[in-house]
Amino acid sequence: MPAAILFSSLMMASCVGFADSAIGVEDNPTEPTKKPETASAKDPGKWWIDESYMDKSVKLSDDFFMYCIGTWWKNTTLDKENSILYRFYDVKPSFTDRVNSLTDDNYSKYKSRLKWADPNSEAAASAQKLYDDVLKKSGLEAATTPEDVMRAFGKMSAMGVSSCIRLDPFGYNGKVCLVVNVCNESYSESKRSSSDATQSDKKTSFRELFKKHPELMQHLVPVSGKSGTRSIPEKLSFIKYILEGMGIDPEACYTLEDWVTLTDQKKSSEINNKIAYMEEWQKIFTDKEKAVTLLKEMIENIYHLDYCLISQKTMEEVNDKLKNDTQAKGAELSLQKVEKTMEENYLPYLRSKLVAEQMVPAGLKDEYMNYCKEMIGVFGVRIKTNEWMSEGSKKNALDKLNAMVFNVAYPDHWIKEGLPDFSKSQSLLEDVYIMRTTRQNLLKAIVGKSRLKESFTALAMDNEAWLGLQNAFYDPLFNSMNILPYYILPPNYDPTQSLVINYQMFDTMGHEMTHGFDTSGSQFDKNGNYTPNGIWASEADKAEFDRRTELLVKCYDSYDVLPDEMPGVKADGKTTLGENIADLGGTEIAYQAFLNRLEVDGYTGDNLKLMKQRFFLSLGEEWRSKYGEDHVNYVAFGKGNPHGADVHSLSKERVNGVVANMNSWYEAFDIKDGALYRAPKDRIKIW
């Protein structure tokens, strides 16, 4: 129900009265006539949660997670292929399968050309001509200075050739800006071991790096030159000329003032490789005697990357060279690798549009946005009535909440220049060039634009954030809450299902909003800029926030992850702190919005009690899953995991850790004791 309708309904409800009954002398004065009671509202939606999954032999105040899904846990068997099984794991087709099946005439034309062309075909001839023309038109051969060589390289990139750099959008100063990244594309697959492949293939985008280490944003400088007292490092000056050739304003592109900062903090070996690669280019660029010759050789090697896409013959030529290359370690060209590279780097925006058009019903975006407004209102009240923050910090928090961008389902508009058109293409090589150029066109269209208008576009073109993912997330650089289609489609949201289930699943909205105020998000202001003091107006407020978050760490540290299989092994409350703050805050927000709705709709008595209990039972269902020791070690503790430990708690703690700190859970089930019981003074409230 839209927020405006809710408010109107509440106002009407508050004005309803009852006519007084006249009491005569003959009436029994000891039994006054009662006012007639309005019958309680009833849930019109379907309560589909299977209560046979519950294990009522478990005392709910000892382990609410197992109380909710314990029988299902006992009856579900893991196998060698699955260290964890989530709810709906057996539903076919899965959401991912449905997304992967989406296509249209344009996209299918590209997919049909994913093959090595016959050397004698028109496709091969067209590709060869295109390949040759790019080099001629770029001016590379005629360039006589290092600067002109790099500008020619930029022109080649604008025509579709891969570059040594990649531009990724991110939020900065309230606008969409671009950060310079390293681009090392490859169509070959190595024969190295799977464990080596996993480690090497791990990518670190600067957008993610800034989210994890926001202090690095203090070292950002425009590629064009100086910003205040900071200036672009000399070792990266060559980048400016590539951007000029590409037709992109260096003023809108950023890099780090001191890349050594990354090395010192040992963010990852992959980042260190980026630094080494950049330094190699700059070293050659400043070689007065050999720069032009050596730079041309490096560029032609990158240009030659796409040679294999011309035909079967050129693919075989490249493969023969790979076999004799000791550094290639037996790598071979793979169409699967071509497809993966294109889909990850250049197709997320097009595929996001397919998801929006073919999976999201008309009107659903607006319907869900109305619920977002309810959540904003609830969170705003919680901030205003917060007992431990000063008025200054409250104002900062409210300003940030009110400035937050709510990206739901899909962008409000699609930028035509950023959508590859394969209708006139004749070859796979041309398709690849089209994808690269349209990505650059999309970046040109959004760079410098307000985060309010184009943050969703910037994210929808990112393989880590495109619309086909089963995800919702908060982006501190844009100060945006992003709910992708998966979370507004059944079974997560369905207008026909129980009101309880829908509102409980709105904890996703509350969760992502709360991330803007967790240990990391609170360091960013309303425009998405990192500030040393964050949203805190006083040191006392920050100290109190830290004290409360430390209590939450200790709370989660006290939980046994798998009491039977791993006795004595506790959860990691420190690693998961940010997500635990968001889980607790998000559930509190969703529950309060739910109570507001119940009041408006007129729930009373036993029906009201039932609805409150079902909210928490639905929380247990949301995190229904079965996992074992292997999953706990790999995911929760990061043993053997190249990505390290997960920042999310395990499912059991995502339920038990939340309810144990919510007064409303104790009230709903009349809880007075139990292993999860925490005295009122010990229940942690942050947001």
List each model region and its residues:
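Short, solvent-exposed loop/turn elements at domain surfaces
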Residues: W72-T76, S188-E189, P491
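Stable alpha-helical elements in mature extracytoplasmic
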Residues: S57-S61, C68, V91, F95, ...
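Bacterial Sec-dependent N-terminal signal peptides
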Residues: S9-A39
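Active-site-surrounding "flap" and adjacent substrate/cofactor-binding loops of secreted or lumenal enzymes
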Residues: K42-D43, K59-D62, Y67-Y131
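Short, Gly/Pro- and small/polar-rich lid/capping loops
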Residues: A39-S52
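Sec-dependent N-terminal signal peptides
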Residues: M1-S8
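Noncatalytic, helix-rich "gating/capping" subdomain that lines the substrate-entry/channel surface
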Residues: V99-M375, P411
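Zinc-dependent metallohydrolase catalytic domains
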Residues: T145-D148, S157, N370-F506, H515-W687
